[in-house]
């Protein structure tokens, strides 16, 4: 059992419920049979608020196509035909700056957003594959990072198969890498 209690009486009933909810999550993270009092200056509260803010930003980025992939070229020592890229995820800020994944992926993991993020990455990568293929007229292979949480999604394989067909990308040109 866990118990979270806001200690400040200002704000609306919804504000108090959000504070109690935050305190409950912190108590739950601390282990069994814990209580936690909500204080605005509490480091755990500040960290939780930060994660919740990032989760909201990830949801906004998903809804508004505000993710971007950067291709990091991988060159084999012996050379060879074609191009091979690892696709690296970034979130685009309103000012155009790019946010590295370590800033927002922990919150996306905690709040169950990774399957949606992974699907967005797959779509972006396959679209990019087609554009690279047309621009280079060479074989193009891409490495796409997926979260471990997406493996439990029973519809992921069908989604990938449909996306490969939709973007006209041969399956052998895509390598999925699982992050820990």
Cite the ranges covered by each PLM segment:
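Catalytic core of bacterial c-di-GMP phosphodiesterases, primarily the EAL and HD-GYP domains
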Residues: 35, 76, 81-86, 113-180
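Active-site core of bacterial EAL-family cyclic-dinucleotide phosphodiesterase domains
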Residues: 49-107, 145, 177
